[in-house]
Amino acid sequence: MSTIVFGSFTCHLDAAIHQDNADRLAKAWTRPENRQVSNVHLLCRRAAKSLINTYESATASAWKGLEEKLQPMFAKREFSKTVTKRKGLRCFKESSEKFIEKKLKKQYKEERERFQFLNGPDAIVNQISVDKCEASVWVPFPHIIEKPSFTTPSMKKKVVFTKVRMSEASLQLFMRRVAANAKANGQKVEIIGRKRVVGHYTTKSRLTYFRTHVRHLDGSKPRYDLVLDEATKKILQLFANTSGFHHVHKKGEITPGMSGFVVNPMNLSDPMHVYDTDLFIVRGKHNSILVDSRCKVSKEQSNEIVHYSDPGKQFWDGFTNSFMQCKLRETDHQCTSDLDVKECGYVAALVCQAIIPCGKITCLQCAQKYSYMSQQEIRDRFSTVIEQHEKTVMDNYPQFSHVLAFLKRYRELMRVENQNYEAFKDITHMIGERKEAPFSHLNKINELIIKGGMMSAQDYIEASDHLRELARYQKNRTENIRSGSIKAFRNKISSKAHVNMQLMCDNQLDTNGNFVWGQREYHAKRFFRNYFDVIDVSEGYRRHIVRENPRGIRKLAIGNLVMSTNLAALRKQLLGEECIHFEVSKECTSKRGENFVYQCCCVTHEDGTPLESEIISPTKNHLVVGNSGDSKYVDLPTAKGGAMFIAKAGYCYINIFLAMLININEDEAKSFTKTVRDTIVPKLGTWPSMMDLATACHFLAVLYPETRNAELPRILVDHEAKIFHVVDSFGSLSTGMHVLKANTINQLISFASDTLDSSMKTYLVGGLEVDKCDEFKNVKLLIRSIYKPQIMEQVLKEEPYLLLMSVLSPGVLMALFNSGSLEKATQYWIARSHSLAAITAMLSALAAKVSLASTLNAQMSVIDEHAAVLCDSVFVGTKPYASYMMAVKTLERMKARTESDHTLNDLGFSVLRQATPHLVEKKLSPGVGAGLERIKLVGKVLCNLGIAAVAKTYTKTFHPERRSRFRRQVRHLRSVITWQPIQTPERRSSAEKRRRCLLHTPVDGKAILQSYRNFHKFSSKHSEDV
């Protein structure tokens, strides 16, 4: 780069100035003759001019070849036009050859006219005429040779349709018929104006709407959701003339899913942005204000608007994306669309409900409820539902054979359940105690098979291994063991207490070292609710001391909870009531072969005498475990409320299952308690034998192996009554009984063996017996007592819970309410028992609600809805009334029935119970009606007797001339009271004297008033005679 200075200006020259020229210029500058200013300036001008010419010639020579090469492009660009592309780029767009030819001809024409005008002779124009002589010569436009076209000429002929012309009335009629056809066939309607508007008819809440397609349904959020011109608007207004357009919408009726609905803005109650008063096209809500799709909104507002688009579109978008990602990539055929899409939707819904039943697929509570269900619950609840879905597919969609095969296999897998409990029990009885091969393998296979569908892959492998071992060993393998005798029998108690790891784990103890039940506490309520009674402390402990059994009695030490401060009296509580002494005999032992099974025998001392039980002191709200060793006291899971629980009638053995619950994992507590309640207890019943109880424990130990080490409560043996007594926290006042040595569930299971030689396995285990009550007879008693005050008074005082049986019939409940019995019960119990007073008040309120219902089914629905509230209010512990448990069971049954009916209704099934209430009402209502008729009859008789007595006294007292007038007044008064017409005999002719006719005499109001005044005066004066 070089520089040159022109005066005070400095110019930069390119490298075109050669170094030699620069040296020559510098030498010329240094000559003396050139140092003058004028010469220097001239020299600089010459040098600069030569350098510039040299640069221009070099530049021209460099660009000359490129310009020649690009000359055709420049020629085309002359006829090109500039266009702006999408991102603002401006470029040339080439023109076609026809366009260039047209332009050239136009230029030629213009140049020819200009040439002729300029070269023509000058003349003064006086007139305009055509000069035929040509004054100038013009070269004609060269002929352009067109390229031949090698394409086949089109054979299409232009079809010109005749224009349709209609009058205004004909056009209106035509559009109405198009709208009716689209509405009937579900077709789309397109209105072509400046913008195309597409819509269709849809139904919502039994109303028909016209729905237009708006832009936000495609996923965008534009400022204008829909653009309508006036012509399109008039046509749209004609198509939108539906029931939904004329319907008056209350506040909140415009909901999501109604985007594009055309409604009348004058019939909307919600606040809205109105575009005009003719139409309102729903877009969504912005700050609780409805927005019309035609309204212009800002970009920020369009993002803030809650669009009322169809929520199902989001579902199908996710379904489609996931389906495309998960579909099979490698198939041996080309997939085609053979099945109907709508039917595919029906079948997909059936499969969804069969696999994961729910009320809504978006409901989180349904999802959590299903995830918390055990396998047994799912199988019991949904196996029949799957069978129904399978039948629906078979009947309506037989072409979906693959779905039918899937549902069938899925149902069979869910029903894989081994219900052969008898076979399991028999195998356990025969060889359950045998630990040697091959019996140990048989027992293990028996334990695995009873699991049924709960077997895992590892269980199948283990079962196959045991079957292989069975093939290797023979069955007839015996051992000879020396036999023992009763005289040499010793079964001393263990010197060490059993170590219960569950009660020693720090993670399951609180800061005070007490056992923490956790989730087991909630599930233990299934035991306390069904098999325990709450002790009412206000009634004392005396009624709970004596525990009766089918073969005798035993006294509890619960009365010792009331202690005296007198030490001498306190020492007397340490003395129990001794039972009949029973020596060690064969009944105290259990043998298998010639060997004693010591855990199934009674405990003895070192000298062979039996260990007899002493008085066992009571405690409050504890579960006492540990049979032969030191006892452990565990807080009851429901002891926080301070209530005391005692085992119900015949269910003392429930304490054993409660002790097993300590060793159950918290996540299995629900399944364990339900298995005991629904499977074990119904089979055991009340007062089961020890063999059945041990078999049930073995069944639970197979399903829940951790319960084998669970400690047992103390078990006393009464050989005289042949009874096992499971001691609870209230101890035992009876002493002198034997003590069973079994300390764990695993040891107690030995009683289930059929090969065990022991008379004790037939002993009974349990509690009190239950008296059964007949519901129908008690309801009849309640109906009879409604109109008999003496019986009702006895019921209110002795069996107040019998009033709850009125919920079985709305007629009985309202008759009880109308007779005032519920009000009397409330007044009677308000000062004696607040719980009973609250129950009678609830029945009164329920009767008032029932009276408002017009039909019998509606009345039963009101009662069913309040059954749960009544059950929770009534079922509070145990009560000393025979009708208490009957009322509780009735309410629990109604509560369970209502819950199951709601579940069926939610799943879409119909309930047939609505057809049966009138049968029950028909059976019970005649008793109520007959009682009411008897009361009316008795009232009429008493009224007539009273009036007759007054008339008789009046006739004896007053003058005879006034008797006839008084009789007439009394007759009027009687007709008014009894609502009967007056019967007056009239004298007829001699032929009709023997006949009498009863005529209706009209009642005179003044005469009746006067008769009443006379009667009142008479009764006040002669009340003693009357």
Curated annotation (Swiss-Prot):
Residue ranges of domain Peptidase C6 in the record: 644-766
Sequence motif: Involved in virions binding and aphid transmission, positions: 618-620
Enzyme class, first EC level, given as a word: hydrolase
Record PTM text: Potyviral RNA is expressed as two polyproteins which undergo post-translational proteolytic processing. Genome polyprotein is processed by NIa-pro, P1 and HC-pro proteinases resulting in the production of at least ten individual proteins. P3N-PIPO is cleaved by P1 and HC-pro proteinases resulting in the production of three individual proteins. The P1 proteinase and the HC-pro cleave only their respective C-termini autocatalytically.
Superkingdom in the source lineage: Viruses
Entry annotated with the keyword Protease: yes
Site positions for Cleavage: 308-309, 766-767
Annotated GO biological process: proteolysis; symbiont-mediated suppression of host innate immune response; transport of virus in host, cell to cell; viral translational frameshifting
Keywords: Host cell junction, Host-virus interaction, Hydrolase, Inhibition of host innate immune response by virus, Protease, Serine protease, Suppressor of RNA silencing, Transport, Viral immunoevasion, Viral movement protein
PROSITE patterns per UniProt: HC_PRO_CPD (PS51744), PV_P1_PRO (PS51871)
InterPro entries: HC-pro (IPR001456), HC_PRO_CPD_dom (IPR031159), HC_PRO_CPD_sf (IPR042308), Pept_S30_P1_potyvir (IPR002540), Potyvirid-P3 (IPR039560)
Residue intervals of the Peptidase S30 domain: 165-308
Family to which the UniProt record says this protein belongs: Belongs to the potyviridae P3N-PIPO polyprotein family.
Protein name, entry field: P3N-PIPO polyprotein
